[in-house]
Amino acid sequence: MIILVRLDYEGDDLQNDLKKMSEINSKIESKIGGKIEGPFFPQQSTLLFIFHVDKYERLNEAGRTFYAEMAKLKLPFVPDTYEVAVTPEEFFG
């Protein structure tokens, strides 16, 4: 299962803030498991991250940790949208 997280950026030092975001992503990967890819620079928003998780429970936990850590560090990323995508096996069981 993947989660596509799109964020906008309202700061003035994207490169430095991305380093901090990388630390958050590493923390999530070690605490929750799975893998986070990105950042990507999509057409619709400033940034795109792709979260790979193996269980539905991890989906909410990864998201809560991601947004809580961003708020704690006062990073100027603003949530745009997120989308969950599953494989047929995950959907049908």
Where are these regions (language model features)?
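Outer-membrane beta-barrel domain signature
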Residues: 70-73
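Short S/T/G/P-rich N-terminal loop/turn motif that feeds into the first structured element of a domain
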Residues: 1-64, 75-93
